Amino acid sequence: MNRTSPYYCRRSVLSLLISALIYAPPGMAAFTTNVIGVVNDETVDGNQKVDERGTTNNTHIINHGQQNVHGGVSNGSLIESGGYQDIGSHNNFVGQANNTTINGGRQSIHDGGISTGTTIESGNQDVYKGGISNGTTIKGGASRVEGGSANGILIDGGSQIVKVQGHADGTTINKSGSQDVVQGSLATNTTINGGRQYVEQSTVETTTIKNGGEQRVYESRALDTTIEGGTQSLNSKSTAKNTHIYSGGTQIVDNTSTSDVIEVYSGGVLDVRGGTATNVTQHDGAILKTNTNGTTVSGTNSEGAFSIHNHVADNVLLENGGHLDINAYGSANKTIIKDKGTMSVLTNAKADATRIDNGGVMDVAGNATNTIINGGTQNINNYGIATGTNINSGTQNIKSGGKADTTIISSGSRQVVEKDGTAIGSNISAGGSLIVYTGGIAHGVNQETGSALVANTGAGTDIEGYNKLSHFTITGGEANYVVLENTGELTVVAKTSAKNTTIDTGGKLIVQKEAKTDSTRLNNGGVLEVQDGGEAKHVEQQSGGALIASTTSGTLIEGTNSYGDAFYIRNSEAKNVVLENAGSLTVVTGSRAVDTIINANGKMDVYGKDVGTVLNSAGTQTIYASATSDKANIKGGKQTVYGLATEANIESGEQIVDGGSTEKTHINGGTQTVQNYGKAINTDIVSGLQQIMANGTAEGSIINGGSQVVNEGGLAENSVLNDGGTLDVREKGSATGIQQSSQGALVATTRATRVTGTRADGVAFSIEQGAANNILLANGGVLTVESDTSSDKTQVNMGGREIVKTKATATGTTLTGGEQIVEGVANETTINDGGIQTVSANGEAIKTKINEGGTLTVNDNGKATDIVQNSGAALQTSTANGIEISGTHQYGTFSISGNLATNMLLENGGNLLVLAGTEARDSTVGKGGAMQNLGQDSATKVNSGGQYTLGRSKDEFQALARAEDLQVAGGTAIVYAGTLADASVSGATGSLSLMTPRDNVTPVKLEGAVRITDSATLTLGNGVDTTLADLTAASRGSVWLNSNNSCAGTSNCEYRVNSLLLNDGDVYLSAQTAAPATTNGIYNTLTTNELSGSGNFYLHTNVAGSRGDQLVVNNNATGNFKIFVQDTGVSPQSDDAMTLVKTGGGDASFTLGNTGGFVDLGTYEYVLKSDGNSNWNLTNDVKPNPDPIPNPKPDPKPDPKPDPNPKPDPTPDPTPTPVPEKRITPSTAAVLNMAATLPLVFDAELNSIRERLNIMKASPHNNNVWGATYNTRNNVTTDAGAGFEQTLTGMTVGIDSRNDIPEGITTLGAFMGYSHSHIGFDRGGHGSVGSYSLGGYASWEHESGFYLDGVVKLNRFKSNVAGKMSSGGAANGSYHSNGLGGHIETGMRFTDGNWNLTPYASLTGFTADNPEYHLSNGMKSKSVDTRSIYRELGATLSYNMRLGNGMEVEPWLKAAVRKEFVDDNRVKVNSDGNFVNYLSGRRGIYQAGIKASFSSTLSGHLGVGYSHSAGVESPWNAVAGVNWSF
């Protein structure tokens, strides 16, 4: 019970009162001394006995009070200071004390006693052997478990000691709490939650240490410990097993203790201080702290097994704060040091193959070999030696007395040699660095290209080695042949020197006062810094090399710059210095710099005098007060002037005159800024900008092409504003004495402080006190008339603009190509050609006069009154709320008021937008004018060049828009939504288009009388409601049905009109009549109740899909009409007729309007025929309908009497189905022609080879090269009705060899050739065949005259088809094919004197492959068979002659007959079966020629021929050849 509780206070006061008021003799108590039964709320200040028969509740035990609970029960007792409660058994009954509070008293629990839920605020609890304490909370007192048991104890600020084989289970020790487990006791399931547990000569099991808790173990055992955030220390021969160490937890093992089976997790610490730790599992991030001095550690880490034993450490991993000391005479092998890991190799210790990763540190005072540094740090301390170190990244620091031998310094790493440190044999790779401090030693250095050496020439520095150029040294205060690059740096200190230094990219050479350098090469990216009083001779500065210096007396620099010019800095003068790439020059007071060039990132500070400096892009120069700059050329750089700059030329870049002054500056593309009492005098502005800021002044500027801007507080005096220049005077700026040319642009505001000047016409102008007078605006000039100010007689020419703000007034402005924007009031403005006046919301224009080419625009809530609109003037406005317009034009008065526009004239850019709910009447839209109606209009006339739209403006559609009596007279009208009632369209340029409705809520309707005449057009989109329209198309007026994908599908798009009258008019059922026969699957049906007159209908068809446009007349049709259908190469799926026209009757006549009355539909031609039921169909039966047979006149004789015994009529014979008469199309004929051509090409080419073999007969044997050219004409007819004329020209070249054999001669040869055939189709069009051939031949000639010849030939054909359809449309295609053929011939040569007769017989065969190809009109073709086999029998008669000049000639004649056996070369066209190109039969051949030998090696021949058969006639066949023998 809490002592401060009200209940407790009441009881205490009551006890005192009773004691004071009631006299009690000594020994007499006010409580029950022997409790039998239940006693409540008593205060015990004497002895009370509670045996097994008694129970007390809420007993208060005060000083001198004692409660003995022996076998009984005590509940809720409070034991005050001096009070005592004893709990034990009696008569085998267990004594129980529940929920006792000890507040300064004592509770003792003996054998057979149990305490449950005790709270110790202060005081003590003793648990003896056999006693049990359950659930005690120790807040401030103490608990002593002496041989007894304590379970579930919470120590929260107090202490507990468990001794003499006591047992504590489930204890929780919070912060400030402690528990001592001693004298053979046992603690199990303990949680040390920030508190402390001391264990001596005892055992602890299943302990959890967290939140900074501590467990100290002496001569004891710790089993199954989990350390989550505290410390366990094993001391004095203690042992631990099965320890888990988590982040923040630590196990310390001293030199006499042992820990076995340890799991160390990330952030956990195992600290072995000379003791033993076995079966360690070191997880990633786990921390191991130990040394090699008597320590034994073994286990596994992320790299594998590791151990420390007998002063040797193998494979140890140090990270995250881990540390290993290698003690004297100890060693470590393959140690890995990661982030925050450290290792110390002490004196006389060794470490081999160490790896130092990023964040790891190794300190060496002993010996380290073969170390790899991967981002970590190795410190070589006094007496330390590192050999064979490889620095991949990271740092090796060689301290005083330390030494490193054979070090590899890789990219991104560095070796630092401090004073009295030594590096031997260091190899610096590209990107690596060797840093040698003053007094450091580095010998045998190998400096590779791209590596960095950082050093100085100070006392004691001793460096030597090789770089990419030569051997180098730094010793005795002198550096020779040093290469500096990639952060390399050499400082030449006072009284020392450097020679032959090379400074490459990233390198830097610093020459201090009284130091000297000679023969320095400064390359791109390198830096040479010569400090005041330093000396650098023979400097060779390359492009991009940076020089940092000043002109201070005593500084000496000489050399050549990057442009090859000699430069110097001496005797307080700098000449030809180039500054770039971080280079800088300071010109001190009393010195000067001449012809300096400042490139990108170069810098120059002038305190003295500067002449002729060039500032290129990104270069900077500052001219300080009292300093001067003359003739600077600024080309992209920046010059800041606090002093004086004269005759500067600014081509690009910037000059800032900040309190200084300039004279005669020339601005040609750059910027000059004058500010802070700076002054620019006589500046010439050709292009670029001069801007005058607050307290800046420009005087006498000439503005030729750039701009002068005068900002607030700035002043421009006597500026000359020439053509192309701009003078911009802003609010509170001033410009006086301006001389303005006619095209000089003045930009000003009426809030300028003061503007005065004279125009080119001599008129003075001004802006003062908010009033602008006679301002001229042109070529970009702008005057802003601000609120409560005014302008008068402003002249706004081309490119000028006047802005009249709210509450401002402009009077008498003239616009000649310029613009006036009116937000206030404009009076008596005149708008000439190109001028524009725009009246904005709440603006008002009064008495504006618009001349031809001028434009007045009135926006919403704008007002324009008393307007005069002359012919050719444009008015742009709408019927929006608030707009009020009134005026006159050539047709009378016009107005817009109350959302009604009347008698508007829109032309030459004029525009009227009629908004929804508003109206326009009697509008005229002329050339260049436009009108958009979202509301209603009537009697609108759209003349040539005018444009009218209904129901749409930009992206707004209005379904309720309506127009009545629209007259389109050469103009254009488009209906997007709404209703058009009664319209007329006339003129060749007149067009009316009704677009497909956007959706169901924005319909498009056409109703009433609509007349299209004089070549005008009416276009109807799909979905337009025309059911109430009566259309008339006359005098070549046309109606177009323009469907889109909204009605694509298997059904036609539907169009319906009430009536259709054609009077030489045209109706196009699809919009693309001139395109190939494709409609993207869209076909239209036009339905009308009545059709009359005469005219033309144009229809699309898709015969392959049995689809097409269609005309339907519900009632009678009268008149004469032509139907035009497009040709196509695609065949119908069937031969069924396609209905194009349906009528309900009448005498109308429909004929096919195509050429000849035929249309090409695939393979066959079609005609239009009536079916006798008022329908007209397309059919491939081209046979004309028979003339009708008149009914016979009735016989006047009376019918005979009926036969009393009639016999039935005999069954009539069935009427045969008529066979349609078909005719192929020209496209089909072209395909068949091409299929018949290839055998003829092969044959013509073969003839040149046969001719070659014939002229060799009986000639000497030689090796020969020969060539022949030939030309053939074939006139061909085929059974399929496809005729053509072929003209072939070709050339063949070959080589052969004739050789003697017994009783004869053999010939072997090869050839190749090319021929080209032009094929003219009888039905129109043409084709061509290009043929490449290759082959060989052989011949055997017996001495008797008998011979045998053979030829084999391969062909590659390229065929092109350029056919024509009946309408003249193209049917083009091409394909490749291959051919193979052979020829065998045998004969006998008979000779009689000079006469020779050679009868012969031959057999020839040819075949070609058959690709499928398509024509451009959709026709497809495939030759099923292309073959030729023929025999030939004939004879040749020749006569040999020798002429007087020795030349031999042999004329000859030949006659033969040929039989072609192949009669089934079939060609498949579309899907209409096979056509047979029948060229079989006999053919007569007649030839003549002559062979001549010009010399023993040169001969030639010439031949001509004629042949004829039933299908092929060759009017000529000519060949000429030449032969060279060798």
UniProtKB/Swiss-Prot annotation:
<keyword id="KW-0812">Transmembrane</keyword>
<dbReference type="InterPro" id="IPR050909">
    <property type="entry name" value="Bact_Autotransporter_VF"/>
</dbReference>
<feature type="signal peptide">
    <location>
        <begin position="1"/>
        <end position="29"/>
    </location>
</feature>
<dbReference type="InterPro" id="IPR030930">
    <property type="entry name" value="AIDA"/>
</dbReference>
<protein>
    <recommendedName>
        <fullName>Probable autotransporter YpjA</fullName>
    </recommendedName>
</protein>
<dbReference type="GO" id="GO:0007155">
    <property type="term" value="P:cell adhesion"/>
</dbReference>
<dbReference type="InterPro" id="IPR011050">
    <property type="entry name" value="Pectin_lyase_fold/virulence"/>
</dbReference>
<dbReference type="InterPro" id="IPR003991">
    <property type="entry name" value="Pertactin_virulence_factor"/>
</dbReference>
<keyword id="KW-1134">Transmembrane beta strand</keyword>
<dbReference type="InterPro" id="IPR036709">
    <property type="entry name" value="Autotransporte_beta_dom_sf"/>
</dbReference>
<dbReference type="InterPro" id="IPR005546">
    <property type="entry name" value="Autotransporte_beta"/>
</dbReference>
<dbReference type="Pfam" id="PF03797">
    <property type="entry name" value="Autotransporter"/>
</dbReference>
<feature type="compositionally biased region" description="Pro residues">
    <location>
        <begin position="1207"/>
        <end position="1219"/>
    </location>
</feature>
<dbReference type="InterPro" id="IPR012332">
    <property type="entry name" value="Autotransporter_pectin_lyase_C"/>
</dbReference>
<dbReference type="Pfam" id="PF16168">
    <property type="entry name" value="AIDA"/>
</dbReference>
<dbReference type="GO" id="GO:0009279">
    <property type="term" value="C:cell outer membrane"/>
</dbReference>
<keyword id="KW-0472">Membrane</keyword>
<comment type="function">
    <text>Upon overexpression shows increased adherence to polyvinyl chloride (PVC) plates, increased mature biofilm formation.</text>
</comment>
<feature type="domain" description="Autotransporter">
    <location>
        <begin position="1258"/>
        <end position="1526"/>
    </location>
</feature>
<keyword id="KW-0732">Signal</keyword>
<feature type="compositionally biased region" description="Basic and acidic residues">
    <location>
        <begin position="1194"/>
        <end position="1206"/>
    </location>
</feature>
<feature type="region of interest" description="Disordered">
    <location>
        <begin position="1173"/>
        <end position="1223"/>
    </location>
</feature>
<dbReference type="Pfam" id="PF03212">
    <property type="entry name" value="Pertactin"/>
</dbReference>
<keyword id="KW-0998">Cell outer membrane</keyword>
<dbReference type="InterPro" id="IPR006315">
    <property type="entry name" value="OM_autotransptr_brl_dom"/>
</dbReference>
<dbReference type="InterPro" id="IPR004899">
    <property type="entry name" value="Pertactin_central"/>
</dbReference>
<keyword id="KW-0130">Cell adhesion</keyword>
